[in-house]
């Protein structure tokens, strides 16, 4: 099982979400603890990062396999997550 770490940016983004949105993102994070490779590998300026989607929500993250850490970089609505 992987540990989850959130960047300060991800924490700020999560604070802005509604309770329902936070629950959806929380489900994504729980799944990433078990299997962080289920996300889609990103490319271009986001190389070595992953995106995991549930409905209209996305979580952008990096994986540290050696230390078993998933670092959440950004979380929120798919329309604003890549800005």
Predicted regions and their residues:
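Enriched for short, Lys/Arg-rich terminal
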Residues: 1-23, 31, 54-57, 62-83
């Amino acid at each position: 099982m992987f540990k989850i770490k959130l960047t300060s940016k991800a924490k700020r983004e999560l604070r802005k979400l509604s309770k329902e949105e936070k629950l959806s993102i929380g489900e994504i994070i729980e799944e990433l603890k078990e299997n962080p490779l289920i996300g889609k590998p990103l490319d271009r300026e986001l190389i070595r990062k992953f995106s995991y989607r549930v409905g209209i929500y996305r979580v952008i993250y990096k994986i540290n396999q050696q230390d078993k850490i998933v670092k959440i970089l950004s979380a929120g609505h798919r329309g604003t997550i890549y800005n």
